[in-house]
Curated annotation (Swiss-Prot):
One of the GO biological process terms: DNA-templated transcription
Keyword line: Nucleus, Transcription, Transcription regulation
Location of region: Fungal transcription factor domain: 26-186
Location of this chain's protein in the cell: Nucleus
Coiled-coil annotated residue ranges, if any: none
GO MF term set: DNA binding; zinc ion binding
Species whose genome carries this gene: Alternaria solani
Gene name as annotated: sol4
Start-end of Low complexity biased regions: 472-485
Keyword Nucleus: yes
Annotated segments matching region Disordered: 463-490
InterPro entries: Sec_Metabolite_Reg (IPR050613), Transcription_factor_dom_fun (IPR007219)
Function: Probable transcription factor that regulates the expression of the gene cluster that mediates the biosynthesis of the phytotoxin solanapyrone, a causal agent of early blight disease of potato and tomato.
Protein name per Swiss-Prot or TrEMBL: Probable transcription factor sol4
Length: 557
């Protein structure tokens, strides 16, 4: 670096938090938080961390970039405190909010010096930009988080993370750095929160998927690596994209139950059986005692699996009754079965996200996926109930005998009766209300679910089914070992995540909420006082929920 910039760096570093505070936050990050995304490699970063503190003067841009990364990690970790294990809101007598602000401000100033010294970035620069985006998300500054994530993606392309590096060459990279480049790009491509259609075709990206093990040996090939969950998500995403290549993704055309069924059966018969046993819906838990993060990663993976199944069938909630009545019996039977599968997937999603919620030792309200999936599951179940209780009294089970009620999503009986679905929706609302003390987004979701619950109950009352328990045929028994009329019965349900793209979900979400500050309480676009329920609610997106949560404080509500 030029001598003038070196002087500026030394001046700025005088504002660095005390070593004891930084040590605490770095240690806490690796113990309780890094398992979620695994953007950095703990052994290498900790070795660099020790060496960095031994430097008298920072003269290299690489060392300055590492300082920014260190500060961004500290700021991110501070969002998840206090926790169950650390219940006070200070570190070494200094308030957490003060430490977080200190780290954010100093990192921003040092980042400016990095950009002035060298325009072209590095893997470390992409990493600290990703942590910056995650910090903004924790603060509910979602648009700024998306903008920063876009910048990280652009920076990743500038430094070639989307291209497979040569195995041997003069690039100065070792095998570990090559693998971390793959992992970083994998995380960026799994960043669903953008809710944007990808603008780069797959052929543009030649980088391989990350390895399951950084240093595979005969002894550890059967043990899941900490990054296995991320790799499996990427594999599932590629699988769904392959299925969608023929007829397009859900939402690209009107819902076709035959196409949706073909996708689902290929998913059940080709993808699920190949998943590692520790991540199955009926998992082998032998490794749990050796890998403490594994149970949480498994639930995170299961959340992704159920969401991907919901993604495949969610469009059926947009079918109007006139169109349904025009379908031949065979297709109507498929729609009926798909509605049951959608409800089952929503129930599975709720179970997984609830388990994940209970396993977390930190402040869960800072992890937006916990809030959002409580909300999304409840919306989908609500619409399943409403669609099944149309005003003309058409019953879901009119054509149920066309198919055997078995599914690889679960080997156990899952109650998807209207009464159980309604209880689940109310429980999701209750949990959101509990989380609302620390999250505007959770508060907004709980309030909107309250409106929706009232509408569901009114619909059930009008249809005369509010207190009716479904017959035994409506409480479906699912058995992964049973054959079905449209599957081979050999799937061993396991989970994964959404398409390998920068989007939350397909479908028209732009108008799902109104943004007029005078009608904030009526932000949802459907009329809750009538039987006519427009179709947009089935595509309530993360973007819209975030927009509402950002509107509230700005409107003084």
């Amino acid at each position: 670096m030029p001598s003038t910039l070196i002087h500026d760096v030394q001046k700025e570093l005088k504002d660095l938090p005390a070593r004891g505070i930084v040590d605490f936050l770095i240690q806490y990050f690796f113990e309780d938080i890094n398992w979620i995304n695994q953007i950095v490699h703990p052994p290498r970063l900790l070795a660099q961390y020790e060496n960095w503190w031994k430097m008298d003067t920072i003269t290299r841009v690489a060392d300055l970039e590492f300082a920014v990364l260190m500060l961004r990690i500290c700021a991110y970790a501070s969002h998840f405190l206090p926790s169950k294990k650390y219940t006070v809101d200070t570190i070494k007598g200094r308030p957490l909010s003060d430490i977080r602000s200190n780290c954010d401000r100093l990192a921003g100033r040092l980042e400016g010096i990095c950009n002035a010294a060298v325009l072209r970035g590095s893997l470390v620069r992409v990493q600290y930009m990703a942590f910056t985006a995650m910090c903004y998300e924790c603060d509910s500054r979602i648009k700024l988080s998306w903008d920063t994530l876009c910048c990280a993606i652009r920076e990743a392309q500038e430094v070639g993370l989307h291209r497979e590096p040569p195995m041997r060459g003069d690039d100065g990279m070792d095998d570990l750095e090559r693998e971390m480049r793959r992992r970083m790009f994998c995380n960026l491509r799994l960043a669903k929160a953008l809710d944007r259609v990808p603008f780069l075709v797959d052929a543009y990206c030649t980088v391989s998927l990350p390895q399951m093990h950084l240093h595979p040996t005969i002894a550890n090939l059967q043990a899941p690596d900490l990054f296995t969950e991320r790799v499996l998500q990427a594999q599932l995403v590629r699988f769904w994209k392959k299925l969608e290549a023929v007829n397009g993704p859900p939402g690209a055309r009107p819902y076709d139950p035959v196409i949706a069924e073909e996708r689902y059966q290929r998913f059940c018969n080709e993808f699920l059986p190949e998943l590692p046993a520790p991540f199955a819906l009926e998992p082998n838990t032998d490794w749990d005692q050796h890998i403490p993060e594994l149970p949480r990663q498994r639930e995170l993976f299961h959340v992704a699996l159920f969401e991907s199944v919901m993604h495949n069938f969610r469009q059926l909630l947009r079918l109007d009754q006139h169109h349904l009545r025009s379908l031949p019996n065979s297709r109507m039977a498929l729609v009926t079965q798909h509605r049951h599968t959608l409800a089952t997937a929503a129930m599975g999603l709720f179970q997984s996200v609830t388990s994940l919620h209970a396993m977390m030792s930190f402040n869960q309200t800072k992890l937006s996926l916990v809030i959002f999936y409580h909300f999304e599951m409840a919306v989908v179940l609500s619409l399943c109930i409403i669609r099944a209780c149309d005003s003309n009294g058409m019953q879901d089970l009119e054509h149920i005998n066309f198919f055997s009620p078995h599914s690889p999503l679960s080997s156990n009986m899952i109650d998807i009766s209207q009464s159980q679905c309604l209880r689940t929706i109310k429980e999701a609302r209750r949990q959101l209300e509990m989380m609302s003390l620390g999250s505007v987004m959770a508060e907004t979701g709980a309030r909107q679910l309250g409106i929706l619950v009232d509408h569901v109950q009114a619909t059930l009352a009008r249809s005369g089914t509010q207190t009716r328990s479904m017959p035994s045929t409506e409480t479906l028994t699912y058995n992964s070992s049973s054959s079905t009329s449209y599957g081979d019965g050999h799937a061993h349900g396991v989970s994964s995540e959404l398409p390998f793209t920068f989007q939350q979900q397909e479908g028209p979400t732009a108008n799902a909420f109104r943004t007029d500050s005078n009608v904030f309480e009526g932000l949802m676009l459907w009329d809750l006082s009538t039987d006519a329920l427009p179709l947009d609610p089935s595509f309530l997106g993360l973007e819209q929920l975030h927009e509402i949560s950002e509107l509230q404080p700005n409107m003084g509500l």
